[in-house]
C-alpha cells in the first residue's frame, strides 16, 4: 500500500479529531479556556486544573487536560496569565498541546461594570504519531520478520508546530457577564505534508454568558444563589450550545446542562446530544468540580464523559485586589 495514500486515508477518517479543538463541560470552572478576558477577572490569583475523559466505554478513548494560572495587577490595570491545554487520542496516539500567554486590560465603565478586552498568543504542536503505523518497507517477506523502522522520508514530518493568537472581550458586574472570543486568528497550517500541502486550523468562535440570582434564606449568613450559564461554540461546520443552571448553597452547587447541536448537518441526528450533570464544592480557597455527560446520541453506549476539576484562589501575586469582581462564579 502506498504510504501517502495510507496516510491520507488515515487522516480522512480522523478529521474530526485533528481539526477540532476539545471542549469542556465545566467551562465555568476553567473560563480562561473559552476566553482570555477572564484573566485577572477574579481580582486575585487563580490556579485551575481539569481532566476530561471521553468515551471510556470504548477502546477509542479521548482525554483532555487544561491548566491555567492568572492574576490581576492594579499597577498595570491588567490581568496576566498562562494556560496549557493537552489533548490525546489513545488509539492513533494523536496528541495536541498548546501553551498560551494571556493578557486582559480592565476598563471600568462605572463603579459596578467592567469591560475586559483581551489577547492571547502562544504555540501549538500537533503530533500525528505515524510511527505507530506498519508500512510496506517494514514488512520483510522473504525473511519473515517485521522491521521496527521505516526508511520512508515522508514519515519524518509527523509533527506540526505553529504560532497562534486569539482575541476576546468580556462585560460583567457582580451578577451578570457576557463575552465572546475568537481562537486561531492566524488560521495556522497544520498539514504534515512537506510538499506544500495546506490544512488550515479553522477559527473557533465562543459566545458565552451567565446570570446570578441571589435567593433569600432565613439566615443572613447563608449564601444561596441560582446561576444560569450558556456557551455557544462553532468551528468550521461543527457547532454546540451548552445551556443550563446551577443552584449553589453554602459552597455546594448542583446543576444540569443540555448540550445541543443547533445546526446539525445530519437530519437524523439528535439536536439534544447529551445531558450534563454537574456539581461543585467549595472548601476554604479550593473549588472541586465533577461532571458527567450522559449521551443521548448514537454514542449512548460509550459510557459518557466525565470531568474532574480543582481550582485554588488566593490573594493577587501582584499585591493588590482591586478589580471589579465577576459574577461568573
Language model regions located:
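Positively charged n-region of N-terminal signal peptides that target proteins for export
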Residues: 1-6, 109-111
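Subset of outer-membrane beta-barrel
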Residues: 20-329
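Absolute protein N-terminus
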Residues: 3, 19-20
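Short alpha-helical segments used as structural interaction elements across diverse proteins
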Residues: 1-2, 13, 49
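Sec-dependent N-terminal signal peptides
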Residues: 5-15
Amino acid at each position: 500500500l502506498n504510504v501517502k495514500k495510507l496516510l491520507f486515508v488515515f487522516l480522512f477518517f480522523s478529521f474530526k479529531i485533528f481539526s477540532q479543538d476539545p471542549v469542556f463541560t465545566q467551562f465555568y470552572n476553567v473560563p480562561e479556556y473559552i476566553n482570555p478576558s477572564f484573566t485577572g477577572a477574579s481580582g486575585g490569583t487563580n490556579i485551575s486544573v481539569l481532566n476530561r475523559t471521553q468515551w471510556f466505554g470504548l477502546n477509542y478513548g479521548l482525554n483532555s487536560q487544561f491548566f491555567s494560572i492568572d492574576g490581576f495587577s492594579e499597577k498595570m490595570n491588567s490581568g496576566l496569565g498562562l494556560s496549557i491545554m493537552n489533548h490525546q487520542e489513545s488509539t492513533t496516539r494523536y496528541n495536541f498541546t498548546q501553551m498560551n500567554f494571556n493578557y486582559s486590560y480592565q476598563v471600568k465603565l462605572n463603579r459596578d461594570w467592567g469591560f475586559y478586552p483581551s489577547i492571547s498568543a502562544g504555540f501549538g504542536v500537533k503530533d500525528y504519531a505515524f510511527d505507530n503505523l506498519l508500512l510496506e518497507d517494514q514488512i520483510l517477506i522473504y525473511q519473515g520478520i517485521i522491521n521496527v523502522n521505516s526508511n520512508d522520508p515522508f514519515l519524518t514530518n509527523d509533527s506540526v508546530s505553529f504560532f497562534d493568537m486569539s482575541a476576546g472581550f468580556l462585560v460583567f458586574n457582580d451578577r451578570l457577564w457576557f463575552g465572546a472570543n475568537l481562537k486561531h486568528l492566524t488560521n495556522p497550517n497544520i498539514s504534515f505534508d512537506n510538499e506544500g500541502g495546506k490544512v488550515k486550523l479553522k477559527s473557533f468562535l465562543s459566545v458565552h454568558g451567565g446570570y446570578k440570582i441571589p435567593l433569600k434564606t432565613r439566615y443572613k449568613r447563608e449564601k444561596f444563589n441560582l446561576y444560569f450559564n450558556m456557551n455557544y461554540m462553532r468551528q468550521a461546520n461543527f457547532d454546540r450550545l451548552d445551556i443550563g443552571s446551577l443552584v449553589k448553597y453554602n459552597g455546594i452547587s448542583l446543576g444540569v446542562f443540555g448540550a445541543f447541536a443547533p445546526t446539525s448537518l445530519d437530519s437524523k441526528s439528535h439536536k439534544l446530544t447529551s445531558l450534563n450533570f454537574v456539581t461543585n464544592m467549595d472548601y476554604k480557597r479550593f473549588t472541586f468540580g465533577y461532571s458527567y455527560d450522559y449521551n443521548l446520541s448514537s454514542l449512548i453506549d460509550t459510557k459518557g464523559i466525565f470531568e474532574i476539576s480543582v481550582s485554588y484562589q488566593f490573594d493577587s501575586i501582584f499585591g493588590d485586589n482591586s478589580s471589579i469582581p465577576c459574577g461568573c462564579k
